[in-house]
Amino acid sequence: MMNDIKVMNHAADNIRILAASMVEKANSGHPGGAMGGSDFINVLFSEYLVYDPADPTWTGRDRFFLDPGHMSPMLYAGLALRGFFSMEDLKQFRQWGSVTPGHPELDLQRGIENSSGPLGQGHALAAGAAVAEKFLEARLGSTMMQHKIYAYISDGAVEEEISQGVGRIAGNLGLNNLIMFYDSNNLQLSTECGVVMNQDTEMKYKA
């Protein structure tokens, strides 16, 4: 049962404010996407993702893969509300040697499942994790292994060929444990997506 909507909105607003504050203090970063994704990250971690904050490396946990690494402020802020990062950690966003770099780096103890790379790579890593889960489930049984893999990708990532290949593989293998959230707003870094690519993304993934 979902938490009270007022509580959920308040939590998401806190993530938004923290994300914007991190970028403002660092005088560097991308606030827009992180603020826009705050509701998603809050709902995912509070209502759907199965994990144990006391045992971040628990084998049976669900996994979340963030593809657009520049949206890291929303992830750090969301994880901070769950005890994985301190407010001091958030203040050190994008600073040399900090645990909150501009683009996330693998740190399972802090809830970071993947190092970000070129757009689309996180999508591929998520599909690989979904394949691994199916492999283990077939051998150990669904009682022990039945976790889900969540991925967050953006318009820019969908334009990359690596994502197209991942979509074909996921469909061919029937990876029903892979749940991809597509942040579709028809915008990329400097233009609308249609300026460089005109495609029916929904139909492409259905195919």
Go through each PLM region and give its residues.
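Short, solvent-exposed loop/turn segments at the edges of secondary structure
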Residues: 173-176, 207
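Cofactor-binding active-site loop characterized by glycine-rich and histidine/acidic residues
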Residues: 36-173
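Hydrophobic alpha-helical scaffolding
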Residues: 5, 9, 30, 65-68, ...
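Generic start-of-chain signal for non-secretory N-termini
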Residues: 1-17
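Short internal beta-strands
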Residues: 65-67, 177-184
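Conserved thiamine diphosphate
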Residues: 138-145, 186, 193-207
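Hydrophobic (often cysteine-bearing) scaffold residues that line and stabilize catalytic clefts
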Residues: 11, 15, 33-37, 71
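N-terminal capping segment at the start of a domain
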Residues: 12-28, 183-184
